[in-house]
Amino acid sequence: METQVVIMSGPKAISTGIAGLTDPGPGDLVVDIAYSGISTGTEKLFWLGTMPPFPGMGYPLVPGYESFGEVVQAAPDTGFRPGDHVFIPGANCFTGGLRGLFGGASKRLVTAASRVCRLDPAIGPEGALLALAATARHALAGFDNALPDLIVGHGTLGRLLARLTLAAGGKPPMVWETNPARRTGAVGYEVLDPEADPRRDYKAIYDASGAPGLIDQLVGRLGKGGELVLCGFYTVPVSFAFVPAFMKEMRLRIAAEWQPADLSATRALIESGALSLDGLITHRRPAAEAAEAYQTAFEDPDCLKMILDWKDAK
């Protein structure tokens, strides 16, 4: 079995090609992908060639871990059947030396049924946003976690953090954004240039920007005993001046990727109408134009989220 895929053969080297797929086994699904998202976090680091080394990485690889599509084949005991629509957080199902480190940017995928999440087909392209929304939910969830009163960055993750804060019954957070073009689209909360915000007593600051060198600035905006949550991915060592953090008795927390419970909880919020994914997808390109799509996603500041459309791919 073969399928069309996006291949990242090195930094800034994106193409489409044909890849072999592993045979489905017991407990597996075969899914035809309709839409896949491009991550401006980890995928961008691979595209730039700046991803810190970790096990399993290397080129050539099939990128993408945000895919939505239709089940076309299901093993008997999976609980799924052809026609079901699911979110897939990537797959490692390729032959011929292609790394499936993420593996979601493909017309067809073979994956364990335990890894997917069933979705209403009416969700459309927004179905590819489930993992990103679940990542935002993961940062907020937990018995002792304070909801943010300041979010740094009004990209897709920052917007989801703000929407989830409101959905959880929290007070409208302040959001900082240095790019004027990204200060639009807020519903129920305010977006400001950091220089226009005089406040210095925030209780919980969530950094969704991933920008280096911000911690000292953010510590100065915390109140006594405040918490700083790092939601981005940082390629350089994270450091900060100790004395200001000591005086503030700052608490530091790092939020990593979603867990299965986050996917289920986020799906429930979407299905109930408590969380909207509207307005997050700003760009959409056919999968055949992947090279241009990746460049736009990573270099155009007006691009919040790029979606690849696989419906016409062979």
Swiss-Prot record:
E.C. number: 1.-.-.-
Broadest EC class assigned to this enzyme: oxidoreductase
Entry function: This protein catalyzes the penultimate step in bacteriochlorophyll a biosynthesis.
Gene of this entry: bchC
Record protein name field: 2-desacetyl-2-hydroxyethyl bacteriochlorophyllide A dehydrogenase
GO MF terms held by the record: bacteriochlorophyllide-a dehydrogenase activity
Organism lineage string: Bacteria, Pseudomonadati, Pseudomonadota, Alphaproteobacteria, Rhodobacterales
Stored Gene3D superfamilies: Medium-chain alcohol dehydrogenases, catalytic domain, NAD(P)-binding Rossmann-like Domain
Alphabetized UniProt keyword annotations: Bacteriochlorophyll biosynthesis, Chlorophyll biosynthesis, Oxidoreductase, Photosynthesis
Keyword Oxidoreductase: yes
GO BP annotation list: light-independent bacteriochlorophyll biosynthetic process; photosynthesis
Keyword ATP-binding: no
Disulfide bridge map: none
Domain of life from the UniProt record: Bacteria
Pathway annotation from the record: Porphyrin-containing compound metabolism; bacteriochlorophyll biosynthesis (light-independent)
